């Protein structure tokens, strides 16, 4: 709801994502929060306060680490990561993947060594029942003659609600 350099989706294109979250229209939102300093933290807090008990996964602008963009110091992204964890948002997303894979300013190393040292569990959808879906049985992937892919699986009945399976 805060204007971002004079623009926001609520006032310009009439999108009220916070209302959609509260009404249960969306289960998760990945807002593009490609800002730094005081242009970042109020937005993160606003999303937390108005999430409607749904997932908010802020998109962090790691492309700004590039000298060809705004040449942010790595510490800017690190502070944003700590802050989004401190206020208990539901993870982070990154734009653009190329800067992560190229390890721009050591972002990949930083994340791997200090933030994502173990596999992450998907946050619970507390507005749903507490039992996660079963792992599909007998998955199959076929290449069709027209070049399309056909994916199928059998419904599994082994769900006891207590196991975590890593694939």
Question: Can you say where each PLM-predicted feature lies in the sequence?
Answer:
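Substrate-binding cleft of secreted/luminal carbohydrate-active enzymes
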Residues: 17-40, 54-128
């Amino acid at each position: 709801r805060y204007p971002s350099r004079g623009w926001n989706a609520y006032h310009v294109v009439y999108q009220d994502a916070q209302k959609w979250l509260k009404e249960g229209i969306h289960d998760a939102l990945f807002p593009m929060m490609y800002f730094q300093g005081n242009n970042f933290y109020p937005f993160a807090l606003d999303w937390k306060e108005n999430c409607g008990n749904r997932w908010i996964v802020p998109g962090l602008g790691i492309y700004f680490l590039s000298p060809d963009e705004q040449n942010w110091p790595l510490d800017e992204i690190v502070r944003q990561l700590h802050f989004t964890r401190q206020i208990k948002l539901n993870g982070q997303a990154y734009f653009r993947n190329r800067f992560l894979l190229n390890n721009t300013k050591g972002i990949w190393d930083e994340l791997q060594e200090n933030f994502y040292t173990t596999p992450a569990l998907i946050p619970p959808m507390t507005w749903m029942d507490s039992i996660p879906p079963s792992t599909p049985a007998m998955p199959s992937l076929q290449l069709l003659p027209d070049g399309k892919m056909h994916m199928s699986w059998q419904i599994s009945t082994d769900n006891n609600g207590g196991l975590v399976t890593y694939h």
